[in-house]
Amino acid sequence: MTSGSKAHPVPATCTMESPPLHLDMGAARSSVCTELTIMPRPLAKSLQDSIDSNFPIDEGFQSGGEDEDMRRLFCNILPEVSTAAVDAPFHYTSSLPSKGVRDKLIGGLNIWVGASPKALDSVTSVVVDVHNLSLMQDDVEDNSPLRRSRPSTHSIFGIDQTVNSSTCGIVEVLRRSSEMQNPAFLKIVIEELRSLLIGQSLDLLWTHQISTPSVEEYLQMVDGKTGGLFRMASKLMIAQSESSNMNPTDLDALMTLLGRYFQIRDDYMNLTSQEYTKSKGFCEDLDEGKYSLIMIHALENCDHKSRVLLDSMLLERRATGAAGLGHKELILSMMQQTGSLQYAVEILSVLFNEIFELVELIDRRTGKVNKPIRDLLAALEIKKDSPRK
């Protein structure tokens, strides 16, 4: 180091054998040689103070110049950036028209649970947000063009930004959950989020591998993918209620059966409902190559020639990324021939009756007749030989 240079004493020095690095900051500032240092700093001391103490301005440095502006830009702590970009996809999804089924379900469950309005708001907020975030991911994974009759989120913001936004949204849900006074809140959210993602992974696996699951495997997938969100709602409500004498097991069973009913109903409506065609496109599940209960039944009950046709069309769908209109119409006619659509209606009827019996059981145990839940079930019921809606 030359005699004209200032020596900067540095504790805990890590010296490199190579020549020191010279930073030319312009003619107004002399060359400065620094050694690579690793130095602990008190947490209370600002980063700017640390920079100033380790790298003092040379005597030849003139304040107000271009170099000082550069130093302020690169060495100062900057304000936090706007979250507008990461929030926009989620806000768009949340703004899409919805029938509010989950809001109605939570409101109905509270007839039994008796959570406070504040607790109810916190549960509804988390459950609805998780639902919308899962829709964003579902549409990316299924390459769905429409969601609730509007362009899907990733078709507007792109896949990368949509995935990033949904991931950030999950982190935000976990942050809010961790700030609740009840420690069980976060545990429940994590537990059922995990169930949801594991269930979704099975759905994706079967589609990717073109592998037909058993009915039992299908139900296990649904219990995670769809039932997880319903159980999250009921468990959070009980955890937030100070006066509930509810048996959690009763509600767990009800929510799991409701999840199965919702998923099978959704699969059926996707193939038969004009309203669903307008909202998501004609038989969109066939574009996805989805192994719904109806598809599983058709594959297991068709003759050999039809099975070869179905398997071949599923292979072709994976190659092209979608099913053609003619393919969809052919698959639909084969499902009708095997009685698969009617089979789904019969299963829905069995589930509906079981759900209604559970509702009556909980009514008796709580001493409260739950009309909102009954009204919701009546609105969702699909009766045998129901016409195309």
Swiss-Prot record:
Residues the entry annotates as binding Mg(2+) 2: 138, 142
Positions of Mg(2+) 1 binding: 138, 142
Required cofactor(s): Mg(2+)
UniProt pathway: Isoprenoid biosynthesis; farnesyl diphosphate biosynthesis; farnesyl diphosphate from geranyl diphosphate and isopentenyl diphosphate: step 1/1; Isoprenoid biosynthesis; geranylgeranyl diphosphate biosynthesis; geranylgeranyl diphosphate from farnesyl diphosphate and isopentenyl diphosphate: step 1/1
Keyword presence, RNA-binding: no
Residues where isopentenyl diphosphate binds: 99, 102, 131, 148
Cofactor annotation comment: Binds 2 Mg(2+) ions per subunit.
GO terms under biological process: alcohol biosynthetic process; farnesyl diphosphate biosynthetic process; geranylgeranyl diphosphate biosynthetic process; mycotoxin biosynthetic process
Major place of residence: cytoplasm
Binding site for dimethylallyl diphosphate: 147
Gene Ontology MF term list: (2E,6E)-farnesyl diphosphate synthase activity; geranylgeranyl diphosphate synthase activity; metal ion binding
Family recorded in the similarity comment: Belongs to the FPP/GGPP synthase family.
Function: Catalyzes the trans-addition of the 2 molecules of isopentenyl diphosphate (IPP) onto geranyl diphosphate (GDP) to form geranylgeranyl pyrophosphate (GGDP). Does not catalyze the conversion of dimethylallyl diphosphate (DMAPP).
Protein name stated in the entry: Geranylgeranyl pyrophosphate synthase A
